Amino acid sequence: MKALFITLGLFVFLNARSQSRDTAHLYNPAADAEKEIAAAVKKAKAEHKFVLIEGGGNWCGWCKRFSLTVANDAKLDSIVNADFVVYHLNYSAENKNQQVYAKYGYPQRFGFPVFIVLDESGNRIHTENSVYLEEGKGYNKEKIAEFFTAWSPAALDPKNYNN
């Protein structure tokens, strides 16, 4: 019985460490954000998707929590992968990417994470304050799904409204 508890404890510890490792380096302070966002826009255009920029940093617990919430939920993961090319835009002491954030209307004023949606041509069409997606000490999965769906290419396609 003691061995079972030790094994279970080790499993929980290693699983928690592997999840924290998955989010430890979401944001790259050394990245050329302008260049990488341009590549994301190019990819989005080719795949008929939008770009979802997640502004934040590796220091941001809420940023990591959001990424884990989406990655660990099959429905959310499916929606985001079907409709968006995701880019993590760094904001940290090492690199605040001030010019890039300025280009998108200073969304850091909302705190982090902050979400910027670009259409397939790279135009900013929406900025989302993450506080509207939060619930308690986590995120509301239904609100995240609504956000992704409301700002998807299909939601903004005029063909879907010409009846």
Task: List the predicted regions and their residue ranges.
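Thiol-based oxidoreductase modules, predominantly thioredoxin-like and allied folds used
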Residues: 31, 55, 73-98
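Bacterial Sec-dependent N-terminal signal peptides
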Residues: 1-21
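Structural alpha/beta surface segment adjacent to cysteine/selenocysteine redox centers
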Residues: 92-112, 121
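Conserved redox-active cysteine motifs that mediate thiol-disulfide chemistry
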Residues: 55-70
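A short beta-strand-turn-helix
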Residues: 32-50
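Non-catalytic, surface beta->alpha helical segment in thiol-disulfide oxidoreductase systems
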Residues: 109-161
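N-proximal helix/coil linker or "cap" segments that precede and/or mark the start of modular domains
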Residues: 18-31
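Loop/turn elements at helix/coil->beta-strand transitions in domains of secreted/extracellular proteins
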Residues: 47-51, 82-87, 112-113, 120
